[in-house]
A protein has these predicted regions:
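Domain-edge interaction signal
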Residues: 1-195
């Protein structure tokens, strides 16, 4: 099996659809780009794929050493365009989509492409602090040099508190939540043929 280059992984992340269902949906923010690459690399490697590129524990968790060079290379190849707004917006231009479809996609295992699409769909719309929390919780070894670990976990606790307060804000009792949860479990068990 040939290893997937980190440049090709970047191309796939930029190419695949996100929640909007459109090819080339943008990735907003350099930290988000770095963390999506990290989560995609680790997810693929956890499933037996080999991906080149070295992430190291750094100030904001896992950091790709070659990130700047890969961004520059992707721009020079025409598969990445960076727009500047409040944040950096990384997108694949139409010519880049055509190039990736012509050159890269025919060589990629469809299951690998599905995994990359799943990562983008699941994580691209998350706020940056939640995305950091996901990466920190899934791969804690990469947080040993983090300067923002406490901030990330405080942010996660804030989200959990808001989630716990949601039923009350919506006027739903705990009993209603438990009843709905039980019904959902029963339906799931029935679908699985267990109940």
């Amino acid at each position: 099996m040939t290893a997937l280059s980190i440049l090709n992984l970047l191309a796939l992340l930029l190419y695949v659809q996100g929640k909007g269902g459109n090819k080339g949906e943008p990735i907003v923010g350099k930290t988000k780009l770095d963390k999506l690459l990290f989560l995609a690399k680790m997810t693929l490697e956890d499933s037996g794929e080999e991906v080149e590129g070295e992430f190291i524990p750094y100030r904001q968790g896992a950091y790709l050493l070659q990130l700047e060079g890969i961004i520059d290379t992707a721009q020079s190849l025409g598969i990445l365009k960076i727009e500047r707004n409040d944040e950096l917006i990384y997108r694949m231009p139409e010519e880049g989509i055509k190039k990736v479809e012509r050159v890269l996609i025919p060589k990629i295992n469809p299951m690998l492409l599905d995994k990359v699409r799943e990562i983008k769909t699941k994580y691209n719309d998350l706020p940056e602090d939640l995305l950091l929390a996901v990466a920190y919780l899934k791969y804690p070894d990469y947080t040993i040099r983090s300067e923002i670990k406490n901030q990330v976990f405080r942010s996660l606790l804030k989200y959990l508190k808001e989630f716990n307060e949601l039923p009350e804000k919506l006027g739903i009792t705990r009993e209603d939540v438990e009843k709905l949860s039980l019904e959902a479990r029963k339906r799931t068990l029935k679908r699985l043929g267990i109940a």
